[in-house]
């Protein structure tokens, strides 16, 4: 069981998340490949650079989501890889007053979708949990477990605050609606600040969604 403790109005609030024993061993990746990190949060990398990267990978653009101000908000690509089957990019917008203008059009975060979820997560009921094998690979690459909020397992790296939000689910536009593992990649400089509950809430607020669930 995972327990988070928070003081609120002179009272102690406990948050309980049931953790389960892994049912068996699962194979995982031979190495940790987090995709186009070089495109992430870079002021000199814009939508055209993402398009060029995906063209070089022979990917197919599936959908493009526009904002109310008619800016490109997100793009979904289908890859030709049978395991890493899709990537979705989310971009900083000119219309967002909180965004420095030099970042507008740059990649704020991206999500990787895997057709074999058990390479990193396993399912218990309606919940997905990171496998011991994938956790070992993540920690070997200097990622620390930040916490679990019932939906996302969050890991982050102290050296540069690269943050991963790992989840499982079914999406209408990905893998023909079959279950996938989703890893959302972003930078969050304050990811280790505050209580565990506060850290998870900050990451959750940042996460973008593009593909509706089935």
Region roles according to the model:
Residues 1, 7-132, 195, 200-214:
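Short helix/turn-capping signatures at newly exposed starts of structured segments
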Residues 17, 126-202:
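A charged, solvent-exposed segment within the mature domains of Sec-exported extracytoplasmic proteins
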